[in-house]
From Swiss-Prot:
Residues reported to bind GTP 1: 9-16, 56-60, 118-121
InterPro entries the record matches: AAA+_ATPase, G_ENGA, GTP-bd, GTPase_Der, KH_dom-like, KH_dom-like_a/b, P-loop_NTPase, Small_GTP-bd
SUPFAM superfamilies reported for this sequence: P-loop containing nucleoside triphosphate hydrolases
Domain EngA-type G: 3-166, 208-381
UniProt lineage: Bacteria, Pseudomonadati, Pseudomonadota, Gammaproteobacteria, Vibrionales
Protein name: GTPase Der
């Protein structure tokens, strides 16, 4: 499972700066759920090939209302969700009573905690950190989050228990250095046909992992119990921590599934609870582990930013998507038309995803969801050969030629599969990285239409074909040199 790192500390110690530094390496979800998660922000970060979730808690001022009250509202929940807690202090401001109060509380909690002294740039770091030894820590880590100094080493140490090979990967230069990181996206990973085949083999003959996600009280639990009830699977509560989703194997129409329940499967008598527990971490973990994501939306409420944030995270993770608009029963025709218009307006960027209008409570339309789930999974995992992809690429360029770049037309040579779930098409050619985004979108839509891909995002990667003779001096043979001398002599004689 993907590890979770929580940033805890009093206000203005640099938690948000470190949070932004860690999450900007990917265009990842930064979800803010006011009222539900208080002031906590959740983001996805990556070090090398390893993903993790980072939580930015609100500032804790233990000297005013007491640590217990403050943490109970925002940070205590984050600490429970986390695998590692980074307790941040300000090296320039020195030790404060708030720091001492927070440290005293953290000592009572059985959670891996690391003391991080921030803002040590431009000062004597050891002298600035000396007072913090009073907090009774075994070791501390000095960083400058604003510049990224010490951040990579800190994260390596924090994640080391979860990824034993993380430090060895760093020695091989595989871990991205977060120091003075630019805002521009990291270079795209190069994919080979061998990578694609290996990816496909892992997916074949595996049960489809289906994650049901959505904001609180949209009907996730009702839908989960409806699905399990139809399949006559025993509904049970599995023990685990608050951040663990429940994995329920099931079978439908001869196809095996693993249902990832983020809401918590309830016994039938408890389905109608009015308050539903909601964990962002649980949802993000479920999306990362799923093949297909079923996003449940409440038809009786407008599409919210939370809905879009969850959808955006699923897209960034490359997951297949099916949309279920719940509580459709009982709405009059005028309201239904308005809901459909709102869906078209706000969800136009996922026009490849099937939308189902259902009633989880009464079971209307629930059975058809699995038709779209299978279609999306099939689209994400169908093998496509190099010859087919190259032919589609040629057809696309014939219908609409690539643009000119510095007086030369971009040339696309061939295409092959680079991966599955999501499908990745790798296109080789000259100056391909100079292609404008509009033409890249054209190619993506052309491949989607030609391959009849539904329910899954598709990614296009571009690789420049290197010229083997570039920067090589062209040495002439002896016969070529004699011919050149004769030609030059003839030119001189003609001038005379």
């Amino acid at each position: 499972m993907i590890p979770v790192v929580a940033l805890v500390g009093r206000p203005n110690v640099g938690k948000s700066t470190l949070f932004n530094r860690l999450t900007r390496s990917r265009d990842a979800l930064v979800a803010d759920f006011p009222g539900l998660t208080r002031d906590r922000k959740y983001g996805q970060a990556k070090v090398g090939e390893h993903d993790f979730i980072v939580i930015d808690t609100g500032g804790i001022d233990g000297s005013e209302e007491g640590v217990e009250t403050k943490m109970a509202e925002q940070s205590l929940a984050a600490i429970r969700e986390a695998d590692v807690v980074l307790f941040m202090v300000d090296g320039r401001a020195g030790l404060t009573p708030s720091d001492e109060a927070i440290a005293a509380h953290l000592r009572k909690i059985e959670k891996a905690t690391m003391l991080v002294v921030n803002k040590v740039d431009g000062i004597d770091a050891d002298a600035a950190s000396a007072d913090f030894w009073q907090l009774g820590v075994d070791e501390m880590y000095q960083i400058a989050a604003a510049h990224g100094r010490g951040v990579t080493a800190l994260i390596e140490r924090a994640l080391d228990p979860f990824f034993d090979n993380l430090l060895s990967a760093n020695n091989e230069g595989e871990i991205e250095d977060l120091t003075d990181m630019e805002d521009e996206d990291a270079e795209q990973q190069e994919y080979s046909e061998e990578d694609a085949e290996e990816s496909l083999k892992r997916l074949q003959d595996q049960p489809i992992k289906l994650a049901i996600i959505g904001r609180p009280n949209v009907g996730k639990s009702t839908l989960t119990n409806r699905i399990l009830g139809e399949e006559r699977v025993v509904v049970y509560d599995m023990p685990g921590t608050t951040r663990d989703s429940i994995y329920i194997p099931m079978e439908r129409d001869g196809r095996e599934y693993v249902l990832i329940d983020t809401a918590g499967v309830r016994r039938r008598g408890k389905v109608h609870e009015t308050v539903e527990k909601f964990s962002v971490v649980k949802t993000l973990k479920a999306v990362e582990d799923a093949n297909v994501v079923l996003l449940v939306i409440d038809a009786r409420e407008n599409i919210s930013d939370q809905d879009l944030s969850l959808l955006g995270f699923a897209l960034n993770a490359g997951r297949s998507i099916v949309l279920a608009v719940n509580k459709w029963d009982g709405l009059d025709n005028e309201v239904k038309e308005n809901v459909k218009k709102e869906l078209d307006r706000r969800l136009g960027f996922v026009d490849f995803a099937r939308i189902h209008f259902i009633s989880a409570l009464h079971g209307t339309g629930v059975g058809h969801l699995f038709e779209s789930v299978q279609e999306a999974y099939r689209s994400a995992t169908t093998r496509v050969g190099t010859s087919v992809l190259t032919r589609i690429m040629k057809m696309a360029t014939e219908d609409h030629q690539p643009p000119m770049v510095r007086g030369r037309r971009v040339k696309l040579k061939y295409a092959h599969a680079g991966g599955y779930n999501p499908p990745i098409v790798v296109i080789h050619g000259n100056q391909v990285r100079e292609l404008p985004d509009s033409y890249k979108r054209y190619l993506m839509n052309y491949f989607r239409k030609s391959l009849d891909i539904m329910g899954t995002p598709i990614r296009i990667q571009f690789q420049n074909s290197d010229n083997p003779f570039e920067n090589r001096v062209n040495k002439m043979t002896l016969s070529q040199e004699r011919a050149r001398k004769r030609m030059m002599s003839a030119v001189k004689n003609r001038k005379k």
